[in-house]
Structures are given as C-alpha cells and as structure tokens.
Amino acid sequence: MHPKNFHQQENQMANLILSSLPMFVCGFWVVMIALNQYFDGRNKARMMLMLFMAVATLLYAGHCVFLNRFYSNMPLFDSLYAFSNLAAYPMFYLYIDSMTSSESHLRRTWWYLAPAVVIGIIVSTIYTIMSPHDIDTFVRIISYKEDYGSGTGLCRVMGFVRFAAKIIFAIEVVTVLVAGSRKITAYNKSIEAYYADTEGKRLVVYQWFMYVFTACAVASIIFNFLGRYRFGDSPWTIAIPSLTFSSLLYILGFISLRQTFTIENFVQEEAEDASISEHLPDCESKNSLAQRIEEVVTQQQLFLRHNVKVSDIAAELFTNRLYVSTAINDEIGVSFSDYINKKRIDYAIQLMRTNPQMTMYEIAARSGFSSDKSFYRNFKRFTGKSPKKIDE
C-alpha cells in the first residue's frame, strides 16, 4: 500500500473514532439509565435525563455521518440532526426542571421542544420531495460549503431553514443557560431554608455544570456559525470538541445516577411536616420569634440533632415552619442551613479544645453532622481553616 493512501486511511479511522465517541458515550448512558429505571423503579428526573441522552445520541450520530461524509445516509441523519440540534439544550433544561419544579410546571415546559419539532419536520419534508439530483447537490456541495445562497429551488429553501435554525439555536442556548441557572439557584435556596444537612440534596455540581455548559455553549454557537465542515478535515480539529463533550457528558451521566434527592422528595417531606404545623399568632413579631428560636435551639441544643429540619424547630415552638424560616433569614440574616451549621462548628471547636483525644469522626458525629465530608466542608467554610489547624 502506498504510504500516502495508508496515511489517509489512518486519518479516516481516527476521524471516525473521534467523531463517534460522544455518540457512544450518550448511547451508553441511555442503556444504563434505562436499566436503572427498570430495576430500581421509575424516577421522573432520570427519565428526563435518559431522553436528553437519547436526543444527544441522535445529535452526535448526525455529526458523525456529516464529518465522515457518509453521503448516502445524509438525508435521514441530517433530518434527525435538524431536530436534535434544537432539542438538546431544551431537553437539558427539562432535566433540570424535573429536579427542581413540580409535575404540573414540567408539563408546560414541553412546549420548549416546539422549534426543534417544527424544523425537524420541515427539513425531513424537504428531503422527501427533493429530486435525487437536488439531494446530491445539497448534500455533497452546498451543505459542506454552507453557501446556502448559491442554491436554487428547494436547495435554497433548505438553506434558509438551516440559517433560521442557527439563529434559533443561539437564542435557545442563552435562554436555557439563564433559566436553568435561576432554577438551580432557587432550588438550592429552598433546600438551605428547610434542611440543616444539605449533603446530597443541593444541586451544587449542576450549578458548576451550567457554568461549564456556558463555555461549551459559546463554543457551540461559534462552531454552529463557522460550519461543521471545518472540523472534518483532520483528526486534530475533531479531537478537542469530541473529547471535551464526551468527558462532560460521561461525568453528567455518572453524577446524575448518584443524585437520588429531587423536588419530589422535598415536596413529600414538606407535605408530611405541614400536617403537624400550627400557625404563628398574629401578635408575635419576627424579631420576637427570632429570639425564641435562638433560645430553644441553644438551650435544647437542637442543632446537635442529625438531619434536623426547620419543621423540627417549628414543632418545638408550636408555630409554622415558614415563619421560622423567614425569621431566621430576615432577623438573623442567614439561611437555616448556615444558622444550624455555624452552631455545630462552634460546638465542634469546643469539643476539640476540651477533648483533644477525640477523633475527628467522633467530633463530627457529636456535633450533629451526618458525614465527615459535611463537617470538613462547613468547618473550612466558617473558620477558613481545616480542623487540624484551628489553634494555629
């Protein structure tokens, strides 16, 4: 074999592997989440994640076919790409929404997929009524050069649809990132206002994912307007976006399977606690309530209870959890979680100084923390030091 031909085959193989990697990562998580749903029972958030990964699989299958110039498969996979390219970010938002919003709100957000469905139908319809010559011209020449204005007839119409899809994509990305970040922030604040132990409940990692996806989204918009064809000439141009998105999607799937607490659990616990709450008398001010909260929490050392909730404090005061949470926020100036954990850290420091023989595990447990990780994280947060350096 001629060295030049061998080098070309090597490049083609590398292109195929790299361009298909994100597709296989997403397909892997579709299978894993489906098995999890079957054996562990249905979970709304994971179902939405599975649908997101399925859409992403179609998206990267379209990329793979395009970048490897599989011309005969282009009409089918380009139609799927037209849909999935505009459905991926809305589906990710639906996944975030399923973890942070009620079922009734989630039903309304399905309309966010409307642009993807409309564009997908239009593109597939145009391919269906195109002549073989027009399809060949569009697939082999116009779509790779992205010179949509040079086409005629249906090729020109397809070009306008493609350009409109790019505009819609950019709008979707910005909308999803802003709305998704707000959803996560609002949800985390609700968790902090209700629970002292927020480990495994807050969506901290997902907030970071939104920041990372912001950077990727900017790259996506740039790639979208530059044209996919620019990344198919060399394995090196495919490698960076392929490995980046493959890694992010794999990490997202891994973390998501470990996230067991969602809005469904929160709403259920709220409903159970609401049944034993009583209303605060109108004559008691927030300042007066804040003083009573401080007294009962300090005197009875309620902060030492594992998994203590704002409803537990409300029950001790014979009042409503909403009033307790509001009084802590407005009068004490912190969230319920920070209020309790600050007291736990102060108590832990006393234990460390009066009982130097105690292990950190014992100190964490006796201070009310449900895990070592939570203890170390809060200790560092409130003191700026690790437990071993507190006296330095």
Model-derived segments and their meaning:
Residues 254-366, 378-381, 385-392:
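Membrane-proximal linker segments that couple transmembrane helices to downstream signaling/catalytic modules
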Residues 213-281, 292-295:
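C-terminal transmembrane-bundle signature of multipass membrane proteins
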Residues 136-137, 189-193, 262-270:
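Short, Lys/Arg-enriched, Gly/Pro-containing loop segments at transmembrane-helix junctions
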Residues 39-59, 113-114, 159-225, 238-244:
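Alpha-helical transmembrane segments of multi-pass integral membrane proteins
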Residues 2-141, 167:
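N-terminal low-complexity or simple alpha-helical regulatory segments
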Residues 27, 31, 58, 89-93, ...:
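Alpha-helical transmembrane segments of polytopic integral membrane proteins
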Residues 321, 371-373:
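The DNA-contacting recognition helix of HTH DNA-binding domains
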Residues 11-21, 129-140, 146-179, 235-238:
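Extracellular-loop-to-transmembrane junctions of the mid-late helices
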